[in-house]
């Protein structure tokens, strides 16, 4: 069936309140969309992260009288009289199929592919990780995840132990295992990430080789041949005393989730204990790698 879409602009401070009003007015769904294609990262547990300039979009049945809806919304404190909005008629589509059509297998480095489950793998002889796009955790589309996957693909991981610090979907740990690592350890602050990583590892047949910890429960004596942390610049700096202890002597460290403009600040937190490589960049993002001294 066709739909009517009501779109209006908001800030991160009032977007949720506006969304609540759209639901109260009869919207069958409400979504939040970045107005300016600004990167945003996975929220902390219990936190909703929105863009500073956010479009709030309400979807209504095609038979809805939108003049009545607008009049109702004008009487709310968060919007008021004459609020700016746009109303559009949406044609009937198979929205799930259209969403699925946007995702294709992606290649990282020489051997590694990340493939949605509904697509055929391009190369059955390659290293294929089956991972479906989700709302919360990484699937390889972000430049920082891509940089980390390419780095892992270029390492000799045979028989190695890998720690994925801030594992999210588990994509990096799972990729490392598929690339030959003997064991992987995933650490995250979010229980949902732990569950997502466990589910994705089972889907890829590597669950027995993946150990998962909430950050508050991780053992004190963890160490690995390779450590990768794709989080944010602030946490990478703050957690440097912890992350720096994880690679064994001669082990590899890979850090991302960092804007190129933040690279020097992050590198300074690690340069005493690691021999750092030249920074790799993709779009405005970067990856910092090095070897434990």
From Swiss-Prot:
S-adenosyl-L-methionine binds at residues 145, 166, 188, 230. Belongs to the methyltransferase superfamily. PrmA family. It is found in: Cytoplasm. It comes from Proteus mirabilis (strain HI4320). This is Ribosomal protein L11 methyltransferase. It catalyses: L-lysyl-[protein] + 3 S-adenosyl-L-methionine = N(6),N(6),N(6)-trimethyl-L-lysyl-[protein] + 3 S-adenosyl-L-homocysteine + 3 H(+). GO terms for biological process: methylation. SUPFAM superfamilies: S-adenosyl-L-methionine-dependent methyltransferases. Methylates ribosomal protein L11. Pfam families: PrmA. Keywords: Cytoplasm, Methyltransferase, S-adenosyl-L-methionine, Transferase. Its EC number is 2.1.1.-. The gene is prmA. One of its GO terms (cellular component) is cytosol. InterPro entries: Ribosomal_L11_MeTrfase_PrmA (IPR050078), Ribosomal_PrmA_MeTrfase (IPR004498), SAM-dependent_MTases_sf (IPR029063). GO terms for molecular function: protein-lysine N-methyltransferase activity. It is an enzyme of class 2 (transferase).
